[in-house]
Amino acid sequence: MFEQPSSTTNTTTSSGSGSDSNHYFELGPRNPINQAHPTSVIVPPRQHHHQIHQQQTDNSPLTPCTPYYPSNAYGLPLFFGTDFLQFQPSDIPSPLTPNISSPLTPHPFGPIPAIPTNQIYNRTFTDFYSTAASSPMVQYSTVKKSSAGRKPKEEDNMEDDDDDKRLKRRQRNKEAAARCRQRRIDLMKELQDQVNDFKNSNDKKMAECNNIRNKLNSLKNYLETHDCKLSREERTHEINRLIIPPSTVPPSQPYLQHSLRVHPPRADSVPYSIRSGHSSSSSEQHSPVEDYKPSIDQLLLPPISCIQNIKDRNINSMPPPALPASTSAAGIHVITSIPVSHANSLHGRSENVFAEPERKIPKIELDQTLTSLTMPDDVERPSALPTLSRIVENQPITTPSRPFRLGGEYQNQTPQSTGNGLFGGPPGPFDLLSSNTGLTPSGQPTMNFVSTPTPIQPHPDADLRPL
């Protein structure tokens, strides 16, 4: 199991009290790693128990409490447990630590006796292990622990810091959980409030629906039990009687007027009402005849050609459609429109005519021309334009004559010539340039003016279109 010791192994023998001696064997050289802890083994010889007690009484430099076996950093033997696997002979090179030989230092308790190598290598590992375990001399070493590593004070500080962090993290988790629970409670409360509001609104709408349904049922019952005063024939007769007849006013009539001839009501009668069939004092039910209203198809409007110019009529009125004069429940005529009286009519008397809103003449906006932009502002429009006179006068018309050659000489055909020529003119040579050709005026022409009715003063109904 063990190899031969190297050259650096020191083997010595010392005699103790008695015939027997203890053999000491140093297993390997000391290196910087195991220098603090000596790795030596004390192999005591086989002897009786009384000899062991006798050796303890001698004044030997070697004390039995000093262990000489391989130990680890905590002072425990390497052969006890699984740490013996870490033990390596000194001759086997280690890949982690170089094999550096160092001189042996003497043992602090004295010289270490050498152990014969033949006794070590001849013994088995189990025998050696049992001998070392059963020997009462083997005791644990009291070597001081190394101070390498963290100090206890720093470890305490680290533990305190870890505890503080753990407590803070736990406190934060508690606060976060409390906030989460509060948010859930608030959300549930808000949802419950919404549910209550919806329930209340639903109850209100159900009550409204029930109320409307009750009203509908009451109206249906009223219609089913209602008895009309007029029969079907009477209703048909009244409706046929109220049909508007066609208009008999000719379109060529210069003046159109229309008014309702109704008898004035009595002093104790119902006042006028715009809507027929509704009075402030009548509380009884009215028949459909009194609430009759003509549709737009039954209204007969006069044609546009019947409306003449405002200068001819001097009034702006338009006849309304012929509306029937209804009768109220009290038997009093109620007009459906209010007549308007005009004092300044053509006939010089006030008549009831229907007022018509004045027609709006659209304004025609013309684009500005280049002439209007270049003309000066002081140029005014003339009040009259010169035109031809209406009096028929004899105006000479000069036209170019046709010269022709007669007998080797040119003759001029002019209607003004009164001689012995072709047209009564004097015979002789004809000068075309000295005669009137009609291309250029021979005298100042007479300009006649024709007066046109151009409006000078502005009038709201005047047509101010450009000439």
Swiss-Prot record:
Protein name: Transcription factor fos-1
PROSITE patterns tied to this protein: BZIP, BZIP_BASIC
Post-translational events: May be phosphorylated by kgb-1. Phosphorylation at Thr-440 increases sensitivity to heavy metal stress. Phosphorylation inhibits homodimer formation, and promotes association with target promoters.
Gene Ontology molecular function: chromatin binding; DNA-binding transcription factor activity, RNA polymerase II-specific; identical protein binding; RNA polymerase II cis-regulatory region sequence-specific DNA binding; RNA polymerase II transcription regulatory region sequence-specific DNA binding; RNA polymerase II-specific DNA-binding transcription factor binding; sequence-specific DNA binding
Gene symbol of the encoding locus: fos-1
Organism domain of life: Eukaryota
Annotated spans, Basic motif: 165-205
Biased composition (Low complexity): 1-22, 273-286
Biased composition (Polar residues): 434-454
The protein's role, per its UniProt record: Developmentally regulated transcription factor which binds and recognizes the enhancer DNA sequence 5'-TGA[CG]TCA-3'.
